[in-house]
Swiss-Prot record:
It comes from Alicyclobacillus sendaiensis. Induction: Constitutively expressed. Optimum pH is 3.9 (for degradation of azocoll). Stable at pH 3.5 to 5.0. Kumamolisin-As does not make a specific three-quarters/one-quarter cut of the triple-helical, native collagen, characteristic for the previously described collagenases. Binds 1 Ca(2+) ion per subunit. PANTHER family: PROTEASE S8 TRIPEPTIDYL PEPTIDASE I CLN2, TRIPEPTIDYL-PEPTIDASE 1. This is Kumamolisin-As.
Length: 553
């Protein structure tokens, strides 16, 4: 039996530390002792992919071509050409067997595998000590020690996720202050006001006569659920046909409405109702996963590589400050978004609702992830005043210290992409003034005071937040895909090459809500509050049509 075929035994060979997995325990967390050794759990292992450099180069080449002429990779062939190798999966299975773990499932295209077993086996396999922690925000499981594996297999493992169960993301929606009498009372008040998604789409001049037919929009959810009766009630009230909605269970999570409109149900039904109202001809696949680093990644990879539903658009309204993620988790997620770009899947994510700090209290400026990924279309927030079906006024959404504000700023993790080099992205406001990926790319109505009329758990309410902007523009992309007859895919590089009149430039406001210096201001052209501005839908479609004269990056 060769060394490669021989099962590993504890102490048989040196172990190597997997870099990028360190995560400090939360302030105020209290160590409550070890997790019971016979408790069962699962982790997601991310394996290296084949020809990783070739995939990135392919995406870069295709990004320089007009969207209608791009050659996206096919899901059917992706696993063989760019997934993890079958040899690596075989090595992982031997490692699992040797440590008393089961390889429950493998996603060859995504290069991920789920290993499960008792805590004692996980501790031995990865060289950690799993422990329980109590915190004012909730209890969680984490670990002491560095994540290690046998040195011979360390080069093939890029991440081990799921050891820590702390939530990695929060939903980016905010309820409008309630008014008595439902929608009618709100509409009669001077302020605040509310719009239906149809109103907002009209103001942004979404192309008419299109409904997303032939497209599948994936929606990522990390909690809550939707009530079919609520959805039916809502779409009937708008006079639009109810779209087909299916739920997909990931890592044991499922469609589980809580009955609390202000909880995660608010996010789930907001996403479906906004996008569904504007693309009722599309199929909607809602991927439910646990709110952990493993769950979030598995939801993304399941959607992107879904061989049956084949989403062409992915909408994400959950996220967290990029600095709160481990570097291994961010790299794994970003790799999945690269897969999406190669496959022609447009991924959109909310930029956050807590202004230029993204809710952190460390005195620094932060952007939200996954919106910060260069392969994700980051969606910021505005305050929209519409009149006669057109924009009367649009400014940066900022409700001040007692409210919310659009996320935005400069990434401390992702470098400035080539396609933003001429966008005048400022240096980071943090010490060192480093350059980085500018967030957001586009913006749309997000202020709860000018929010969206929706029905959550059977209750009529008004919701804002950048959570609404991701599904709003996901529906726009679905309409454009329908018209083009193919998916536009990775849009970011193209958007920055389009004429300025494709967007409504937003030049008033800032996203500081911490009573500090107003570092990030709106202004002409791209800015770290609203990106390029709000898209003018018909002009964006026209610019992407084959007949358009498109500048090449």
């Amino acid at each position: 039996m060769s060394d490669m075929e021989k099962p590993w035994k504890e102490g048989e060979e040196a172990r190597a530390v997997l870099q990028g997995h360190a995560r400090a325990q939360a302030p105020q967390a209290v160590d409550k002792g070890p997790v019971a050794g016979d408790e069962r759990m699962a982790v997601t292992v991310v394996l290296r992919r084949q020809r990783a450099g070739e995939l990135a180069a392919h995406v870069e080449r295709q990004a320089a071509i007009a969207p209608h002429a791009r050659e996206h990779l096919k899901r059917e062939a992706f696993a063989a050409s760019h997934g993890a190798s079958l040899d690596d999966f075989a090595e992982l299975r031997r490692f699992a067997d040797a440590h008393g773990l089961a390889l429950d499932r493998a996603n060859v295209a995504a290069g991920t595998a789920v290993l499960s077993g008792p805590v004692d086996a996980i501790n031995r396999a990865f060289g950690v000590e799993l422990r329980h922690f109590d915190h004012p925000d909730g209890s969680y499981r984490s670990y002491l020690g560095e994540v290690t594996v046998p040195a011979s297999i360390a080069p093939m493992i890029e991440a081990v996720l799921g050891l820590d169960t702390r939530p990695v993301a929060r939903p980016h929606f905010r309820m409008q202050r309630r008014a008595e009498g439902g929608f009618e009372a709100r509409s009669q008040a001077a302020a605040p006001t509310a719009y239906t998604p149809l109103d907002v789409a009209q103001a942004y001049q979404f192309p008419e006569g299109l409904d997303g037919q032939g497209q599948c929009i994936a929606i990522i959810e990390l909690g809550g659920g939707y009530d079919e009766a609520s959805l039916a009630q809502y779409f009937a009230s708008l006079g639009v046909p109810a779209p087909q909605v299916v739920s997909v269970s990931v890592d044991g999570a499922s469609n589980q409405p809580t009955g609390d409109p202000s909880g995660p149900d608010g996010e789930v039904e907001l996403d479906i109702e906004v996008a569904g109202a504007l693309a009722p001809g599309a199929k909607f696949a809602v991927y439910f996963a646990p709110n952990t680093d493993a769950g979030f990644l598995d939801a993304i990879t399941t959607a992107i590589h879904d061989p049956t539903l084949k989403p062409s658009v992915v909408s994400i309204s959950w996220g967290g400050p990029e600095d709160s993620w481990t570097s291994a988790a961010i790299a794994a997620m970003n790799r999945a978004f690269l897969d999406a770009a190669a496959l022609g899947v447009t991924v959109l994510a909310a930029a956050g609702d807590s202004g230029s700090t993204d809710g952190e209290q460390d005195g620094l400026y932060h952007v939200d992830f996954p919106a910060a990924s260069p392969y994700v279309l980051a969606c910021g927030g505005t305050r929209l005043v519409a009149s006669g079906g057109r924009i009367a006024q649009e400014t940066v959404w900022n409700d001040g210290p007692d409210g919310g504000a659009t996320g935005g700023g400069v990434s401390r993790i992702f470098p400035l992409p080539a396609w933003q080099e001429h966008a005048n992205v400022p240096p980071s406001a943090n010490p060192g003034a480093s350059s980085g990926r500018g967030v957001p790319d586009l913006a749309g109505n997000a202020d709860p005071a000018t929010g969206y009329e929706v029905v959550i758990d059977g209750e009529a309410t008004v919701i804002g937040g950048t959570s609404a902007v991701a599904p709003l523009f996901a529906a726009l992309v679905a309409r454009i895909n329908q018209k083009l007859g193919k998916a536009v895919g990775y849009l970011n590089p193209t958007l920055y090459q389009l004429p300025a009149d494709v967007f409504h430039d937003i030049t008033e406001g800032n996203n500081d809500i911490a009573n500090r210096a107003q570092i990030y201001q709106a202004g002409p052209g791209w800015d770290p509050c609203t990106g390029l501005g709000s898209p003018i839908g018909v002009r964006l479609l026209q610019a992407l049509l084959p007949s358009a004269s498109q500048p090449q990056p």
